[in-house]
Amino acid sequence: MQLERLQKKLGYQFTNLDYLLQALTHRSAGAKNNERLEFLGDSILNFAIGKALFEKFPKANEGELSRMRATLVREQTLAILARKFGLGEYMKLGAGELKSGGYRRESILSDCVEAIIAAIYLDAGMDKAIAQVHLWYQDLLAEMKPGDAQKDPKTRLQEFLQGRKLPLPTYEVLNIKGEAHNQTFKVTCKIEMLEEIFIGIGTSRRKAEQNAAEQVLAKLTTK
């Protein structure tokens, strides 16, 4: 069964699958969708990550903790987790959203991750939901340092590779679509130690490169 595969990827087995099904349902696909779950999951995620950072960095000030949390809970990071779980294969979208490639859109992917966090909370309680967030984020949290939250993904990737005496990444524009005022850039990022080619998407070349670098970092720092 498809949902069995997804639950293995998530590392959590639902007692009530209805919660998971609702978390996977976008508002374009019906009335019983994941919007309310996303609202709740956002709060649980912020608390879980805030708690982990508070305990991990006893000397960090409020500003540093806030910046690190913002880095970890932002849309791009959640979308990377969603792709790792392959959520695009399991989400239920309306016909229009499906046709426009909604299953690839970062906002939809990130909302789905937050909805799943809420679904776990409803299924098993707060302690389990927090533990699950910590499990998903354990490698990202291990790499996090107070000053790093202010650095962009390209800088962090460069420093990660330099610190291990590895060659720097190469970026290349794959294509540019749209009119001058509304363009979408696709950029590849390659590093020597990984065979995989990472594709970043953004409204500018810089944003696309940052997106690709973020994906590489996630690959390097998650199991």
Swiss-Prot record:
Keywords: Cytoplasm, Endonuclease, Hydrolase, Magnesium, Metal-binding, mRNA processing, Nuclease, RNA-binding, rRNA processing, rRNA-binding, tRNA processing. It catalyses: Endonucleolytic cleavage to 5'-phosphomonoester. Its EC number is 3.1.26.3. Pfam families: dsrm, Ribonucleas_3_3. InterPro entries: dsRBD_dom, RNase_III, RNase_III_dom, RNase_III_sf. Residues 3-125 form the RNase III domain. Gene3D superfamilies: 3.30.160.20, Ribonuclease III domain. Residues 152-222 form the DRBM domain. It is found in: Cytoplasm. SUPFAM superfamilies: dsRNA-binding domain-like, RNase III domain-like. Its cofactor is Mg(2+). The active site is at D42, E114. It comes from the Bacteria. One of its GO terms (cellular component) is cytoplasm. One of its GO terms (molecular function) is metal ion binding. Mg(2+) binds at E38, D111, E114. GO terms for biological process: mRNA processing; regulation of gene expression; rRNA processing; tRNA processing. PANTHER family: RIBONUCLEASE 3, RIBONUCLEASE III. Homodimer. Digests double-stranded RNA. Involved in the processing of primary rRNA transcript to yield the immediate precursors to the large and small rRNAs (23S and 16S). Processes some mRNAs, and tRNAs when they are encoded in the rRNA operon. Processes pre-crRNA and tracrRNA of type II CRISPR loci if present in the organism. Belongs to the ribonuclease III family. This is Ribonuclease 3. It comes from Actinobacillus pleuropneumoniae serotype 3 (strain JL03).
